[in-house]
Amino acid sequence: MSAKPTTLYDKIWNDHLVHEAEDGTCLLYIDRHLVHEVTSPQAFEGLRTAGRKVHAPEKTLAVVDHNVPTTDRSKPNPDPESAEQIAALAENARDFGITYYNEFDKRQGVVHVIGPEQGFTLPGTTIVCGDSHTSTHGAFGALAHGIGTSEVEHVLATQTLIQKKAKNMRVTVDGQLPDGVTAKDVILAIIGEIGTAGGTGYVLEYAGDAIRSLSMEGRMTVCNMSIEGGARAGLIAPDERAYEFLKGRPLAPKGAAWDAALRYWDTLRSDDGAHFDHELKLDAAALPPIVTWGTSPEDVISVTGRVPNPADIADEAKRLSKERALAYMGLTPGTKITDIKIDRMFIGSCTNGRIEDLRAAAKVAEGKTVNANVNAIIVPGSGLVKEQAEAEGLDKIFIKAGFEWREPGCSMCLAMNPDKLAPEERCASTSNRNFEGRQGFKGRTHLVSPAMAAAAAIAGHFVDIRDWH
């Protein structure tokens, strides 16, 4: 009798299941643990108090990213609390024997950029981090998701995690993406379709021609924002594109171990006939460049559209929520998206801070000048991304056009470091969240692709990137 068809999520889950209790609570083995300075101090302190060691330091990688300044690092950190957290991570990594990339190491960067870059992220592995955007690593066919600080301590101590199994959802995007439409637009469109709660209780598997055609950078962008759709994690089955990206990376398998890994990785795809609890299909050809207008990632609209009118929403709670969003964003229903002016622009983050993103922005910026009323910063996702961009001359293009070229870090994605919006400043951002106060107190965030962000910085307002050239 042939085995029951199985989803990719089920395969990875079953390979890592240590124990399942009668109530469905499971103990899962964790292959990789990424650590940063914000969610780890209490976890390490818990280990010290209990007299425990890190169970598998070789499967743990630490990096500073959230609090680190992206300007001159030869000067002291201006925020004492941030400086304390950075110093604590360095001390904890040293005391517990964990590999650590500090702010002066060229391998340093945003945790979800450096994992794949180093080959620490591998197909078929379970990966956790005290950060919600750990779902990024699902682009390689890894089961990856964020955990809380108490869970960080549990994984450090045991290399296992207690959780319940999620349901399966498949999101299929078929067809070819039009010019000017990117992976960022794909995931924003998906979130707009299912809402920020639509993926709750699910692991999303992305499939279809449009997904397969994406670069690894693009796939990481899609999986990165799975959490904004409410999902536990996002997955894309690994293929030759993933293998090519990983081959030769410092921490990837070598020689016979690589060949053995490939044989296993080739099994990591959902079987024909595997059951999904929910299916969603999108037509890639119908997708436009997208701009968010509100304070939730589900508040999406085509760049050619107008700010919607909440009065058209029948559900009272949702209507009031969208009215509040418009008031916070300082927008009027019916306003053309291309008439919305910006004050700031941010290209970077674990969503869009990779070399492909910087190349796309440089293509838009070359020979142009940033609008006099806009402050625009570009923050590479890692020191190695920065090094590669500079080798390609992208930094010169940006600086000549009037963009600020920064050091790697989380930067303006979140208001935990000096890169913040002032109250009521409006930002075109390539990050992943547009919540109230996310980029600074009363700051106004519009989520867009790197090319759309660069074009807005130059024009001073949102423009349809399809008309740019």
UniProtKB/Swiss-Prot annotation:
Keywords: 4Fe-4S, Amino-acid biosynthesis, Branched-chain amino acid biosynthesis, Iron, Iron-sulfur, Leucine biosynthesis, Lyase, Metal-binding. PROSITE patterns: ACONITASE_1 (PS00450), ACONITASE_2 (PS01244). Pathway: Amino-acid biosynthesis; L-leucine biosynthesis; L-leucine from 3-methyl-2-oxobutanoate: step 2/4. One of its GO terms (molecular function) is 3-isopropylmalate dehydratase activity. Disulfide bonds: none annotated. Binds 1 [4Fe-4S] cluster per subunit. It is an enzyme of class 4 (lyase). It comes from the Bacteria. InterPro entries: 3-IsopropMal_deHydase_lsu, Acnase/IPM_dHydase_lsu_aba_1/3, Acoase/IPM_deHydtase_lsu_aba, Aconitase_4Fe-4S_BS, Aconitase_4Fe-4S_dom, IPM_dehydratase_rel_enz, IPMI_cat. Its cofactor is [4Fe-4S] cluster. The keyword 4Fe-4S applies. [4Fe-4S] cluster binds at C350, C410, C413. Belongs to the aconitase/IPM isomerase family. LeuC type 1 subfamily. Heterodimer of LeuC and LeuD. NCBIfam families: leuC, PRK05478.1, PRK12466.1. Catalyzes the isomerization between 2-isopropylmalate and 3-isopropylmalate, via the formation of 2-isopropylmaleate. This is 3-isopropylmalate dehydratase large subunit. It comes from Rhodopseudomonas palustris (strain ATCC BAA-98 / CGA009). The lineage of its organism: Bacteria, Pseudomonadati, Pseudomonadota, Alphaproteobacteria, Hyphomicrobiales.
